[in-house]
Amino acid sequence: MHRQAHHRSGLDRINQAAYRRAGVLRQYETASGWLEPGEQAAVMLAAKDVRGAPVLDIGIGGGRTVPLMRAISDDFCGIDYSPAMVAVARRRFPDVDIRTMDARDLAFPNRRFALATFSYNGIDSVDMPGRLLILAEVRRVLRRRGRFVFSALHRGSMVNLPHWPDWEVFHDAGLQPGRLFRATARLLAGGINHLRGLGLVRDDGDVAVASLSAHNFALLAIFMSLATQIRELHEAGFAVEAIFAPDGQRIPPDDPADDGAPWHHFVARKVEARRGYC
């Protein structure tokens, strides 16, 4: 085991603040089941080789994935870097091993787990140096040929994303004063959230940082092209076994056409150890 130093970037501060908000916590507390067919397909593909073996669930939020992962193995540990989220998950699952921990600095020995998962595009919520630390740490704690299943936002979908100002907030308001007031307040709050992260927004073509309409533009995230994501995994010591679109359609890793899907689910395998790797 080793400890790594990392600083909190502006993106970190914005996102961690969002994850402490009561409204966000309530949404995560009630989430359950598979998000979509693509998520289920990716996890089930990896699960075939790791049932009963140790599982690490990163970024568990309010605990949505806990029953899903424990159906694969009782040797389970869930982590999240948000103490508020961990408190929610522990209330829901008091007998489960759930810890406050940052994926950039995993407090586990080398080769501890057979499977690591990171759902909800959580890997996109840290900056690029942090993202590479996560991949290195996940690889370190995985066993030989261990699997890493995660979802990541797709650069090719950004043209279809809602942007602030999002006038859709007035769609159901009609002419009712109360609804109009709430819609206006939401629009203005979204504008404040958007401006808070505006200095971090960028677009380098294959990689971009943008605000998400989720939680009223309170979150910033990285968007990456499929080819860039695959290259990043290869350079981090993983082989890409499968990619799934949200609807469950499988995308060939060796010919990754940039479709318009908002995100993809990846199944990556830890490659054979090389000098300098665990």
Q: What are these model-derived regions, one by one?
A:
Residues 104-116:
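A short acidic, Gly/Pro-enriched loop at the edge of an enzyme's catalytic core
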Residues 253-278:
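Core SAM-dependent methyltransferase catalytic element
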